[in-house]
A protein has these predicted regions:
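Long, low-hydrophobicity ectodomains and other hydrophilic envelope-associated domains
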Residues: 3-161
Length: 161
């Protein structure tokens, strides 16, 4: 039996390393995902993206596939939910769009980095997002592990969308 290079066996410290630099800390139930800051001001569409995709509208850029982040969260014992979606329903003679909310377990997202003065900084991801035009910090947000879905060809949609 061979072990794929994308997963390395846990060390005695309870840490599993995945491809893309992902580190699963089993004892503390933490997943560390390396990233770099793409933009420090401007409008954003999402918090993070893959390199070569939406750097112009994301705060962070990661080099690992979303399916590996999903795997890491499963490795620390979380259960994925289902992403939110829109569904068209016929009501009488009309069609309406119904919002189906996401489901999943709550997660806390923290950001750790060294600032330009060499100081270590740790904050919630919400503290990295400011409202406009008043500049208020984004309110504490209940993030959840929804995962993604698989398309008809069996591909994890978040890996290519």
């Amino acid at each position: 039996m061979t072990v794929k290079k994308s997963i390395r066996q846990p060390s005695s410290s309870g840490i599993i390393h995945l491809a893309g630099g992902i580190e699963c800390r089993l004892d503390s139930r933490e997943v560390l995902v390396p990233a770099f800051i793409a933009i420090d001001s401007g409008w954003i569409e999402q918090i993070a993206c893959l390199r070569g995709t939406r750097e112009h509208e994301s705060i962070f850029v990661v080099e690992c596939q979303p399916s590996l982040v999903h795997s890491a969260l499963l490795l620390i014992g979380l259960e994925s939910g289902v992403p939110g979606r829109w569904q068209e329903r016929k009501r009488g003679e009309r069609y309406e769009i119904e919002r189906i909310p996401p489901t999943g377990v709550p997660v806390r997202i923290r950001v750790r980095f060294t600032d330009t003065d060499g100081r270590f900084v740790e904050s919630s991801v919400e503290e990295m997002v400011m409202g406009s035009p008043d500049g208020a910090v984004f309110p504490p947000t209940p993030w959840m592990f929804c995962g993604s879905r698989f398309d008809r060809e069996g591909r994890y949609v978040a890996d290519y969308s």
